[in-house]
Structure formats: structure tokens, C-alpha cells
């Protein structure tokens, strides 16, 4: 295998200060690719287990509420310290155990249900809920350092992996297949990530490349001590503090600029809660006044909200000022327009409220992440957990609204069961 010349240097560091362990660049690329694929598979497992939990059944409403609330709450948890890394592997084993038990019970059939029925029984849903919680904890631990301190392209790639995995796994109920094929598919999705984590994959890269992916969220990229080249993965002695230049600004002038204001964190939280409550209320009013099937275009509307967020981020790159706060007034104006159209185009109003909730929530969280990343805040652990929890809450809202919009009597893409 061809090796890069810069990685064959005798010195442990190259001219740019990067640690040289003699590995080819291809090995690092492969380790990082496996790590991101692991994140995608973990998100797909979470979405697939969530679709099983939210399948129609005698306890569908309770299971769906427990799943949505649990995803929102567990997403805000801080990641364990580096010494508690085996905790994530315990969650991975619990996911395999609970998911495997749910698959076996579904295949054999519970009392009162047929083997392989599209609508799982209560015990199967409870086991699937446990597997979903375990998958969420593993996924939250994997993406924890990537939500605040990672560079922009790496963060966007991580978010794309999470969104793609959740979409594929969560949409399983719409293309559910029966018989042994469904059991084989469920087993493949469950066993795909295995009992490992994405950090295990990232740790196989060289110290220079894995540093961004496994850095503790409470640290800063510039403050992290270099790793010992003799023992990869072990931090070396802390770097001496950089002396302040005599012509630079005083310390008391630059310190406040590096501290995130509390309102920067709570504005997206309040925005999400308000937009989510308004969307759920609109859906309930529509379901009450319109008997029969729900809104079949909800998955497209949810995806359209993401497209609107992507366009907003592209527009944000053009002007020199931040558009995050003005977007709140745009969203308020759209809601006023919806109130005027509710009596003539009720279904369009529901779609607009749902898509607007997804759009404004993600836009505010992305704006918060952009500002915090520039400021390099000291309390990175709390802020990274807040960002991750807000993202997961948006998708928990999407799952919950999807259940409210599911036509009565439909189970996993079939009707009449």
C-alpha cells in the first residue's frame, strides 16, 4: 500500500505540527468513514425501533408519548466523561438484547396476535421502546463532540447522517413487508451497528484526524494538549500558555466576547416549544373537524422543512449580518397569514404550520450553533448537550405528529388490520 511521504518522516511531527504515526491517509479516511456510517446505522436503528413503538395497537398512544418524551429528555443529557466510555458499550449491548427479544417475540406472536403481524403486541412495543432508548443513548454519545466544536463541514455531515438514518428507519412503517423478509430486514438493521460505537471507529484513525471526532465537548480545539506520539490516544503534557501580545486588547475587554449570553440558548428553546405546541394544536383541530384519513403528505412536509432550512443557511452565507433573529418575525408573519386562511384552506394551513415549525426550530438551533462555535464558549458540555437535545426534540416532534396524522386503522403501511 502506498504511504504518504509526510507520514514517513522520522520526526514525530511534520512541519505543520501534526503527529506522525506512519499510517497512510487512506487508513484514516477509512476509519472516519466507518465512524460516520456507524452514526447513520445507529440513527436508522433508532428510527426503526421508533416506528415499531408507534405502530397501531391497544397501547399505541402511551408508547408513542413515552418515545417522544424520552427522546426529548435523553437528548439533553451530558455525555459521560472519557473514563466512563464503557457506559456507551453497555447501552449498545442493551439495545441488542432488547431489540433481539422484541424481534423474537414479534416473530413467534404474542397471545392475541398473529406471528409477524403488522401491528405488534404490547410486550413487543415495550421491548422496542427499550431498544430505542438504548440506541438513542449510544447515538447521543457518538455525536456529542461533533455538535459544537467540530468544523462546519464535519458538523453538517454528522447532521446529514443522523437525519438520513432517522428518515430511512422511521419510514419503515410505510413500506413494511410481511413474512420472513421483514424479520430478516429487522435483524439486519438491528445487528448492523453491533455492540460498538462510532468512537471506537474514530479511535482507529491517527491522533491528528481523530482529535476532532473524539474530543471531549468541554474542551476547546485550541486548548486541547497534544497527544503523546509514543502512546496514541494519551494526551501529552499541557501546552504552555501563550503570552499575550503587548499591542493586543486587554484581557478584560476580550473575555466577555467569549461567553455565550443565556438568551442565546433559551431563544431557540422557547421558539421550538411555541412552534411545536402550535403545530400539534393545529393538527388536533384538523383531526377533530375532518373525519377520515389524516394528512398523507406529512413526510413530504417534514422533508420540505429541512429543504427550507438548507436554503436559509445558503442565504445566510450571502449577507454580512446574522439572519437568525429576523427569521422569528418572518415566522410570526406566516402564522398571521395562516390565521386568515384557516377557514378556506384548512389542510394547507396545517401543512404550513407543521413545515414552519420544523423550519424555524432547526433554523434557530443552527443559528445558535453558528454563534456559539465562533465564540468558543467555556461551558461547552452544557451547550453541546443543549444543541443535541434541541435537534433530537425536533425529530421527536416529527414522530409524534406522524402518529397523530396516521389514519385510524392503518398499521405499518396497511389498512384494515
UniProtKB/Swiss-Prot annotation:
The chain crosses the membrane at residues 57-77, 90-110, 119-139, 146-166, 175-195, 263-283, 291-311, 323-343, 348-368, 389-409. Residues 232-243 have a biased composition (Pro residues). The keyword Transmembrane helix applies. The keyword Heme does not apply. Coiled coil: none annotated. Its main location: membrane. It comes from the Viruses. Residues 221-231 have a biased composition (Basic and acidic residues). It is found in: Membrane. Pfam families: Herpes_UL43 (PF05072). Belongs to the alphaherpesvirinae HHV-1 UL43 family. This is Membrane protein UL43.
